[in-house]
């Protein structure tokens, strides 16, 4: 039986590819997709979800837009990475359908309520919508199997020296998620920076030759440009968000550890930092499964294999 999932995202090139991977995988049953502000403004990320589902001919999936700003802060976006539209590069179709007439939290709650079994929430943007859901619907916590997030890092940040972008945008929301008591799986920069897509991988995807694989290659063409900056030391572009879906499909590709994680919400230099108690120094019980390594070639092979679904 397919695993029911609810995807909360802020497309974003890597979010878009996570959607592609999830919907090409019969092991997963995508019940709904909600959008969060982050990689671009809330209006643009919602539109990008609709554009991607139109491309994939999955206009049957309920979609709703989420919070327009973080819980306690002003919104920061990553337009320097993802461009003016949030999905610059390919020519994507205009949305062929409309979002639900409700908020992201309302759609999430409805999805959980109606599911016969607990649902896995996959969150690849800031954690605002998920935190609002947890705070407003404590009665539904038991309907959440786990929360798989792309965010954080044990070491270096990518938005500040200490913080990864998704967590930095709304650290208060991330702290609510980590301390919720619900199992959390964290795909942070420690693993996503190893999940790099090289130019030759992009060409491999393009050569698959269907409309979706071509769009994915064109998304990566744009995404690779930002990551060519020598400061990163990358060979390719880290494909952050699809690591969450890949872990659900093939956990054997990833090395994980069980650790306690907290989020710094007030630090002068460390705001948004995920504090991972790697050496068990706090005495706190582990609250997260933290990804620390990935079989890069296996990850690329999985993407290539699933892109053939769209032939």
Curated annotation (Swiss-Prot):
**Which GO BP annotation is one of this protein's?**
purine nucleoside catabolic process
UniProt key word Hydrolase: yes
**Active site annotation, chain numbering:** 240
Which keywords accompany this UniProt record? Glycosidase, Hydrolase
Extract the Pfam families matched here: IU_nuc_hydro (PF01156)
- Enzyme Commission number: 3.2.-.-
GO MF, one annotated term: uridine nucleosidase activity
Q: Does the keyword Transmembrane apply?
A: no
List the GO cellular component terms: cytosol
Q: Which cysteines are joined by disulfide bonds?
A: none
CDD domains attached here?
Answer: nuc_hydro_IU_UC_XIUA (cd02651)
PANTHER family from the UniProt entry: INOSINE-URIDINE PREFERRING NUCLEOSIDE HYDROLASE, URIDINE NUCLEOSIDASE
Described by its record, this protein's role is as follows: Hydrolyzes with equal efficiency cytidine or uridine to ribose and cytosine or uracil, respectively.
Similarity field: Belongs to the IUNH family. RihA subfamily.
Name of the protein this chain belongs to: Pyrimidine-specific ribonucleoside hydrolase RihA
Species source reads Escherichia coli O139:H28 (strain E24377A / ETEC)
Recall the taxonomic lineage recorded for the source organism. Bacteria, Pseudomonadati, Pseudomonadota, Gammaproteobacteria, Enterobacterales
């Amino acid at each position: 039986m397919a695993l029911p999932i609810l995807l909360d995202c802020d497309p974003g090139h890597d979010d878009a590819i996570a959607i592609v991977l999830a919907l090409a995988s019969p092991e997963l049953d995508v019940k709904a997709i909600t959008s969060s502000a982050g990689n671009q403004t809330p209006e643009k990320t919602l539109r990008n979800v609709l554009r991607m589902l139109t491309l994939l001919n999955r206009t049957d999936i309920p979609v709703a837009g989420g919070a327009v700003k973080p819980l306690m802060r002003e919104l920061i976006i990553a337009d320097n990475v993802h461009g003016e539209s949030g999905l610059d590069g390919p020519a994507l179709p205009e949305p062929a359908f409309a979002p639900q007439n409700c908020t992201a939290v309302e759609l999430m709650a409805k999805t959980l309520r109606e599911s016969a079994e607990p649902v896995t929430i996959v969150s690849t943007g800031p954690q605002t919508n998920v935190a609002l859901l947890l705070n407003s619907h404590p009665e539904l916590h038991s309907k959440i199997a786990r929360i798989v997030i792309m965010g954080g890092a044990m070491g270096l940040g990518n938005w500040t020296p200490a913080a990864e972008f998704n967590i930095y945008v709304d650290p208060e929301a991330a702290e609510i998620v980590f301390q919720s008591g619900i199992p959390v799986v964290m795909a942070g920069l420690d693993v996503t920076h190893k999940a790099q897509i090289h130019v030759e991988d992009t060409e491999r995807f393009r050569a698959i030759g269907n409309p979706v694989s071509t769009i994915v290659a064109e998304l990566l063409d744009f995404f690779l440009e930002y990551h060519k900056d020598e400061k990163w030391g990358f060979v390719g572009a880290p494909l952050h968000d699809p690591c969450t879906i890949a872990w659900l499909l093939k956990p054997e590709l990833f090395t994980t550890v069980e650790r306690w994680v907290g989020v710094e919400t007030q630090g002068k230099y460390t705001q948004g930092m995920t504090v991972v108690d790697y050496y068990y120094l706090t005495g706190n019980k582990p609250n997260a499964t933290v990804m620390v390594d990935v079989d890069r070639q296996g990850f690329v092979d999985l993407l290539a294999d699933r892109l053939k679904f769209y032939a």
